[in-house]
Amino acid sequence: MAVRKLVPETAPVVDDAPASTSVDHKRSLAHKLLIELLSYQLALPVRWIETQNELLQWPETIQRYVEVGPRTTLVTMAKKTAARRASSQIVSASKLSTLKFLCTSDNTAEIYYEYPQESGAPVEEEGSKSDAAAPALAVSGSSRTATTAKATVTTPSSSSPETAPPAASTPSQGTPAGGSTTPDIPLSAKHVVLAMIAQKFRRAFDNIPTQKTVQELSGGKSTLQNEIMGDLAVEFGQLPDGGEYIPLDALGDALQGNFPGKPGKQMSSLITKLISRKMPGGFNQAAMQNHLEREWGFSKAHGQVVICLAITVEPESRLESADSAREFLDGLVSRYASYAGITMTPRGKGNVSADHSSAVMVDESVLNGIKREQRDYQIKELELLSKHLQLDTAADDAVLNELRASQKSLEEKLDRWASEFDDKFFSGIEAIFDARKVRQYDSWWNWAREDTMRLLSRMRPGQLPLQHLQEQGLVAQLLRRWEPSCAEIVQNFLDTGECKEPFLATAAEILRLGSDALKKSPVYRFTTPSMKPRTVISATGCVEYSEVPRENSSYIALLKQGLVAASGERVPYVHLKKKAPDQAWRYDAQSTEILLEALGTGSGAGLTFSGKTVLVTGAGPNSIGAAVVRGLLNGGAKVIVTTSRSVSSAASFFQRMYRECAARGATMAVVPFNQASKRDCESLVEYIYGAHSPVDGDLDYLVPFGAIPEKVELSKLDGASELAHRAMLVNILRILGLVYKEKEQRGLRTRPTTVIVPLSFNLGGFGGDGLYPESKIGLEALFNRYFSGNWSDYLSICGAAIGWVRGTTLSQSIRLLGEAIEHANGLDVITFSQEEMAFNILALMTPSIAETCEEGPVYADLTGGAKAIANIKDVMAAARAKFLKESSIQKALLAERAYEQRVLYGSESPRNDTSSPRPRLSTKRARLSLEFPEVPSKSDLKAHLVDLQGMVDLSRTVVVVGFSELGPWGNARTRWQMEHLTDLTPEGYIEMAWIMGLVEHFQGHLDGKPFVGWVDAQTKQPVADAEFKEKYQAHILAHAGLRFVEPDLLGGYDPSKKEFLQEIVVEEALPSFSTSKANADAFRLRLGDKVAVRRMPESDEYLVQVKRGAHFFVPKAVPFNRGVAGLLPAGWDPLRYGIPEDIVQQVDPVTLYALCCVSEALLSAGIRDPYELYRYIHVSELANCLGTGAGAQSAAQRLYKKRYLDHAVQSDILSESFLNTTAAWVNMLVFSSTGPIKTPVGACATAIESLDIGCDAIRSGRSQVALVGGYDDFREEASYEFAMMNATASSVGELAQGRLPREMSRPSTTTRGGFVESAGCGVQLIMNAELAIEMGLPIHAIIAYTQMAGDKIGRSIPAPGQGILTAARETSAGHDSALLDLAHRRKRLTDEVDAVHQWVTQQLAATRGPAGWPDRAIDEIEATALRKIKHAQHAWGNDIRCQDPSISPLKASLATWGLTIDDVQVVSMHGTSTKANDTNEADVISQQMDHLGRRPGNPLLAVCQKALTGHPKGAAGAWQLHGCMQMLQTGIVPGNRNADNIDSKLRQHRHIVYPMESMPMPQLKAAMLTSFGFGQKGGIAVVVAARHLFSAMAEDELEAYRRRVAKRQREADSAYVSGIMSKSLFKAKEVSVWGKSDASMSRMLLDPKARVGGHPENNNNNNNNSSSKRNTSIERLTRLLLPSQKPETEASPEGQQSTSLTASIQALLASQSTTRPTSTSIGVDVEAISSIPMGNAVFLERNFTRSERDHCFSSPTPQASFAGRWSAKEAVFKSLQTPSVGAGAAMAEIEIVSDGGVPKVQLHGRAKEVALAKGIRNIQASITHSGETVTAVALAESSPMC
């Protein structure tokens, strides 16, 4: 009927059809019908829409649609219509799924029902029953599918309800030979759809719910939907309309009709990519198919299903071998079988007995004969080939024999070496000297400045007492290194008045002594009191050692006391000997006197070593040599000190030694040196006398104190003993010979080097000390060699016999015996401390002793008499035995006492015994907090700051309310801890462990018990707060901060194998490889005739062979020397923050950084829901100014590199690479703001440019809130290009210099070599202060000033510039401008505000109508007055440069807050560690300070944050800003831990000091930060402490603000901790702030007053209560009529303000009295609080009711309360507009009562009568206290009189 209706011409045919029964007749009718339809189509307009709708209504009747034509045009249209009708449920989808759409061009066989020949048994009836349980993936591809054997089907238990596969049929087939039954399921459209969509979503095929649509799976991302549907269109051709809204199952059914049963173009490409990228060489698609067939019994068609699904679970990296690939396929088959609900068994697990039957036995002799014959043939073939190629194999044999002989000889030598020496000796002589690793220190001048500031910081009230400064030797050390800039610093300290007694005199004395010190050489002075050893047995039986003062505390007096020699002569403990005629060394009194004089000078005036050059070996920690070096540095010497440890580990010890001890002119070079190595001895001396000598090419003194401890007997001497002997004897002599040789060659005869030869009193008496005595005895031969050798003109010998020295590393094991030694045999021997022995040796290095040594060798006996102990070993053994015995007795007594107590009390200790309390384990819990800044009280502010109340327009003052960062050291808090503490706090360890995924929070049952707390992420065991440091410190330090690049964090990028592409030309044809047809065609297109392509037999794959002459790119890897970076802590995961997985997969990593930072920044501002902002501001008033230097580098890498390499890349990657995309994601997922998105790109100065843009937006009023900051990532491309510019530090070069990764960023140092890249993000939430106060948000700091600047003409983009000098631009007139005076500006502002209020009075008088003041008039007057006042505040407070541009912008911004350029105490420097930047930056800052007149001696403390964090580029300025705010809040200035030696070029900049350690600076007022970016981006910002803003607030306003902030902190801390525990710090918004409705959006965007939920303080806006409206009117009138109160600190005539205000209001009322009575009247009164006579009881009783008096007396300030009520009574009386009965009339009839804190008016007596007579029904009153005055306004409302 449908055809008859649409095509009337067919009516005869159609009408005749029902009557027909003959098949032939039906065919004839069908033929006629077809002809008529074709004729109609050709002759008349086609009505295909109606035709389709009509035909598709009868799916039960019409099941086959056949298009006659060359293409599937109409059929495609019909399929789309059918799919659309199914999705809209017009017709049942199950009915439409049975339809067939065929075309004569493609489906001839099906149209004519031509079936292929079938084999096997027919399908049994039971098979149909199992069809319903089979999965949909097994659906037949078409009606032509061959019938095969039935498979056993099981339902997988692992299938979830959401993803459980639907049913399908599985025909049966014969059982394979292996014994397993494998169903034959051909590839269907469903398989392909599932595989392609799962691959696109990066999920496994069994994780995709097929009941969902593409639209649902993509989460509404239109680009992703478009990409998927585009790929499906390439694969299948035409798709159903609205295919993205069709469930995947139905979509597969809809596409099945024309599916050819094999992968199409897109799927083939994905399979090819899987094979080429992940499979091992040679394991192609055919190999995969063969394995599936042989191992699992898959047919070719069924195997295609598994191969297609493989693209969804591809391995992370290329599989190494074919076995690995087969294992991968086996795992995939198991997973597929579970998903499809089928059971599969590998054939190898079936019946294998047949395999054994096929084994063949071969006779062994026959096999050996075959092998022998084959070998003979191969040898003959080799000989023929050698002859043909003219190769002499015999000659090769001779060479081989020679090599073997040489090898044997070497082995024999090694055997002899090993038999004579051992591995300890061999490794012990290894050379370690490397001139590149020498550390040189000469920046004593900077440490002098730092010491001066530290010393002065302790000379303030409440700091350390004066005597403590003297005891620590701080003053003496400072005077040693005094320089002119130190005098400036002290003088400034005295001039500013910060110094108070008793420190005032001390500072002045230091200044005087410093002036004297400049005229003298620095000296070493020995001031240590003499101590003696004491060993006691404690009450617990432990042997305890200590040192106590000697009776004779004078060390010099002790030495002179001496011993009585055998001759009866008293010999000092330290004395000199000379050789007697009998060749024996005798005490020499004359020379000893010279030594004692030197010692006396050293303990008095001091010894100077200025200009002397010294080499000291063996100066490790706790050594005599180290103490000697300290003394030499104190005396101003130039020292070379050697270390056998790695320089990186030893440098910190020596650097601290230099920083603490170096005097003026002192230098120190630390040299790696192995004294047991001959090569090192030679290299060291060559270095000393070479071109780069740190001691000017010669030595004055040589102190070879290097030693190796030994503890072996003669019977056990080994290689270590020989090594020690070599170091302590042989190589000392070698060094002397090398020095002599160098001096002789240079003719340095007149300057002999004095050698302090280390001798000992131990010449074998100790025993068990190896060859140590022999080494020392051998050195004594030098005394004789001096005369027999030829070097006496170049070297002088002074032998120093060292006595018993306490506390050295070598004597640690015997330090307990010191007291026994001193009393041994009654000899009265003395032992020495390290400092005492070092003093003795330093006395030997004085000019007088040196002159004595030039006359001949000198023997210095420094043994203290220990040499006289003959039986020292016995003495030591007896002492040990005594200690052991006494200790044992004491322990036995202790045990006995414990036993007694146990018997008596049942415990080991008596109940009242508290002498030895048991240690208690720490149970302190960490407290995670966002660390809100403290808000001081008004009284605290008044004590330290000027009062700025009313002086600043807070609506145009920019403050930071929240900030956050993500970098190498985690967040801002953990970075700050590392920066100023060099360690993490307990809270810091917890946060870092959480960030790195080491722990997680657990709440539930653990080991069967309820548990809430932290657990280890791997072991799931509980971790107590106190255990975090112990468990995780090593891991955190190894995987955070600056470190070697971890390839796992960068997608496999390994700098040691940096990849490049090398173009090559093929010289010989390459072996063929298989690939898809599409790839084969692509190779032919690229290589042309240089490639041969042919199809593989019985396969869809093609063989490709690259021919000779083809050229293409081959990857290669080269080592890259930038292998250190500041990556995010290993283990950081955005999912842990709560970012959805689909977002993580979609966006670039920098976007994830920003999202994490924004969420935490909001919490640090106390904002849990960002939409809360829109309760206070319009959605268009939030600006997003996040910027970046390089943008989404990972996305760019995928866009260019991976796309070029044909890797899988998301289709919308281009949008992710845009520089503004990150800011867009932040807005889409967090803010939903319609404010501007501004994306600054300022290279390394991006964050400051962003801050500048945000501040401009807020100050201009275009925005009230701004999100600012910057971000950048670390990627290999940028890293390489930075290296090409020589901007970054070479990690290879740094390692060669002995630098560890954490040391490679060294801003401002002599050895800096470029910056170290890092990655991260920094974000701040800024807003105007007025809004921040209203919302109760924490104010971290004030952004007082920001500026960006370009630079000069040039050709270099990276060149540092000086454009930001313009921030200090100022003329001489501006320097002394009166506008810089706060008092002057306050007076001018007060005048303008008074004028505004006079104008308000006039306007109110002019606009008052019969019914009072219209609301609109009040609105206009109020707005205008407020605008005028704010304009005045801005002109006289915020921006004084608008009146006088000659004032410097920096000065003007500081003057706003009552500060000067001298109040800036810290500068956070860009400090990149490049040569050019660090010197340029210091120069710019110094010029600015000089030009602005900063006081000399008031240096800025430089903070170089990049020493810790590296250089994050875009985030650099943000991290600096965070550091500045943290300094202002804590009063701590962090040091630059890597500043081991400040560049001497920076010494000229006296306005800057570079501290190495953190320095306390309480009450920091302001900080400055500078930033410089490539491309002429110079930035500067000034940050002021928030307390200066609080000083501009009224006391009640500040207190209310404090309460709001405290509440926010509690809520924010709770939300932060909860977010960490639940992994939900980030919460993506699903709905815009206005909801889902477009109409709601339009209303909000078009209404400037639209707010979310109404303003929190105006929630009753819809309340029509008249009382509420009247209250509002009174408050507004009060604000309009009251001028701003003057600060209490400003002097003004008494009563002037009150009189002026009263007069103005009286004038207004007088002008109104002539008008007729109206419905509203107003009364205003201002009273001085002090005018209320509180002592006059009569006055109080006459004018105040009893309840009023009770209320006032109960208030904290009764007088102010009485004054408020008195003023209100006066205002009410005036509002009644009745004649006064006199000034003495009582006012008790007007009663002011308090109703919940709101004043209410009650009238009595005559006052009430007057009110009733005038028709007054209601009187409202408002009372305002301010300073010393109180003001009241009353509004009386009455009915109009007729």
Swiss-Prot record:
According to its UniProt entry, the function of this protein is described as: Fatty acid synthase alpha subunit; part of the gene cluster that mediates the biosynthesis of azaphilone pigments (MonAzPs), a complex mixture of compounds with a common azaphilone skeleton very widely used as food colorants. PigJ and pigK form the two subunits of a dedicated fungal fatty acid synthase (FAS) that produces the side chain fatty acyl moiety of MonAzPs, a beta-keto fatty acid. The chain length control of the pigJ-pigK FAS is somewhat flexible as MonAzPs features either a beta-ketooctanoic or a beta-ketodecanoic acid moiety.
Effect of inactivating the gene? Leads to the accumulation of pyran intermediates devoid of the medium-chain fatty acyl moiety such as monascusone A.
Query: Under which name does UniProt file this protein?
Result: Fatty acid synthase alpha subunit pigJ
Q: Name one GO cellular component term.
A: fatty acid synthase complex
Write out the ranges of the annotated region (Disordered): 120-184, 1649-1672
How might one describe the protein's use in biotech or industry?
As colorants, MonAzPs are widely used in various food products for centuries. Moreover, MonAzPs also possess wide-ranging biological activities such as antibacterial activity, preventing hypertension, lowering cholesterol levels, causing hypolipidemic effects, and displaying antiobesity and antitumor activities.
Beta-ketoacyl reductase, as annotated region: 611-807
One example of the protein's molecular function in GO is:
holo-[acyl-carrier-protein] synthase activity
Q: In which pathway does it act?
A: Secondary metabolite biosynthesis
